[in-house]
Regions:
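Pyridoxal 5′-phosphate
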Residues: 1-258
Length: 258
């Protein structure tokens, strides 16, 4: 869990940017982005938020969060792969240079100079991934039809159920216990590598993620080689956690654990 006090201790006169996740994809901790942004802006620091895990699971109000940039991965919102969204404040998007050149993003090209198109064209070089964009539009409408409040309520109930279930399972250790938690539940089994856990569970039709989850430094701090992660979505049920628990017991039996 990351607190405002911890962030403040890390800030030095050299700090220019705070880059932080909105929802940890290991512990599920929901980070207080609004408060961190207020602190950062009071010191002239830019805030960049990794919202890939936050966007599908949390209600977003960018004016309220007030961060400078917020990145989203579309496939985590039941959309297509190969597509992302970057929200940015207009003043920064106008000031920063484009990272890539190509058709559609320039205004005028001369031998000795170049001028770029207006936003958002300036950052969208070349042929757009039209099919993916159209598909993602439908994904957003799908989520809106359900209601993000309903998504959050459903996932919170599932995570609470899963936590209580796995807490009772000997040899299973849950990773992190944040006060505010999203739809992620990571764990380890004493004496069993997470890759072996995932393989055995896969044989039972239980799909989890095993590894560092793009967070090697966090795992190093936790002094574990990796972790197994169960993530919930709108399609999951409590019965899925029952099946997960049964498969974990099968895994323990294979490794002669009680």
């Amino acid at each position: 869990e990351i607190t405002l006090e911890e962030i403040e201790k890390k800030i030095t006169p050299k700090t220019k940017i705070i880059s932080i996740t909105h929802l940890s994809n290991v512990t599920g901790a929901i980070i207080p982005i609004k408060e961190i942004t207020q602190l950062a802006h009071s010191k002239g620091i830019v805030v960049v938020v990794d919202g890939c895990q936050g966007a599908p699971h949390l209600k977003l109000d960018m004016q309220n969060l007030d961060c400078d940039f917020y990145a989203i991965s579309c496939h985590k919102m039941y959309g297509p792969t190969g597509l992302g969204v970057l929200y940015g404040k207009k003043k920064w998007l106008e000031e920063l240079p484009p990272y890539q050149g190509g058709g559609g993003m320039i205004n005028e090209v001369k031998k000795d100079r170049i001028s770029y198109g207006d936003l958002p064209n300036k950052y969208e070089a070349g042929t757009m991934a039209t099919a993916q964009v159209i598909a993602f539009d439908q994904s957003i409408k799908f989520l809106e039809s359900i209601g993000i409040e309903n998504v959050m309520k459903h996932e919170a109930e599932l995570i609470e159920y899963g936590q209580e279930l796995l807490k009772k399972n000997n040899s299973v250790k849950l990773i992190g216990n944040p006060k505010k938690k999203g739809g992620v539940l990571s764990f380890t089994i004493e004496g069993v590598h997470p890759h072996d856990i995932a393989t055995i569970l896969d044989e039972d039709g239980v799909a989890i993620r095993a590894g560092h989850h793009c967070c090697q430094i966090l795992h190093e701090k936790l002094n574990i080689p990796a972790s197994a992660r169960a993530s919930v979505g709108i399609y999951n049920t409590k019965e899925d956690f029952d099946k997960l628990n049964a498969s974990i017991n099968k895994c323990k039996k294979i490794f002669n654990l009680k």
